[in-house]
Design a protein with these regions (language model features):
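Catalytic glycan-binding domains that act on GlcNAc-containing polysaccharides
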Residues: 19-220
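Amphipathic alpha-helical coiled-coil segments
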Residues: 1-7, 11-14, 18-21
Length: 220
């Protein structure tokens, strides 16, 4: 009886824990996020714990997430400056227009910088899954096919989970166990399985192992 009570208490603690995501209108509990991830995983074949881990990692990358293009930000933080113009300006305008959002005050990610202060690539990623606008546009119809909702919204938690799962599946995540997951996660971060960024994939898989235990406790 004591063990059963402890198990139920542990499950309730996990279920009610806040699942921290940046770039969403409201916080959700881990229990709610776990249900979404389990549903998406069942539809796509991508491990739910891995989905939870990727979105956790994306929203905890730190200072670059959603801290550009906010109301009151200086011009050098505007979407016109932080995005790659030829690739992402037009898709960003299309996404915000379809959702009735003002592109000039819709938060996007800032570029990353190395230890010497040199800019690495571009900013402009959207929502909790941190898709760049041009990549998101390639998944909108696929996401809507799952949800029955148009247009797909990168700031919607369910849409973000689905987009992440579809991207990982496209990168072969379900083809061969842990190594396939590692390579797919690396591609999610770097665009290709570049081992320079192995720290990212290593960290995501470590987070996923913890979430696997949590999901078992919840019976998911």
């Amino acid at each position: 009886q004591v063990m059963l009570a402890d198990s139920k208490k542990r499950a309730q603690e996990i279920r009610s824990r806040l699942y921290q995501l940046l770039g969403v209108a409201q916080q959700i509990t881990f229990g709610e996020a776990a249900k979404i991830a389990t549903w998406v995983g069942g539809q796509t074949g991508v491990r739910p714990a891995l989905l939870l881990a990727v979105l956790t990692k994306e929203s905890k990358l730190g200072v670059n997430v959603g801290l550009c293009n906010r109301p009151g930000d200086p011009e050098n933080k505007s979407w016109r400056k932080v995005m790659k113009a030829s690739r992402d300006h037009e898709p960003f305008l299309a996404i915000t227009k379809s959702l009735g959002m003002n592109p000039d005050i819709t938060p996007v990610s800032c570029p990353m910088y190395d230890k010497q202060g040199n800019k690495i690539g571009f900013g402009g990623a959207l929502g909790p899954a941190q898709f760049i606008p041009s990549t998101w546009m390639g998944y909108t119809s696929k996401i809507s096919a799952f949800t029955g909702k148009t247009p797909a919204n990168p700031w919607d938690i369910r849409d973000a989970f689905i987009a992440t799962a579809l991207y990982l599946k496209n990168k072969g995540v379900a083809s061969g166990g842990a190594n396939a997951e590692w390579r797919a996660v690396l591609s999610f971060f770097a665009g290709s399985p570049d081992s320079t960024y192995r720290f990212y994939a290593d960290n995501v898989l470590a987070i996923a192992r913890g979430y696997e235990d949590d999901l078992k406790t919840l019976g998911l």
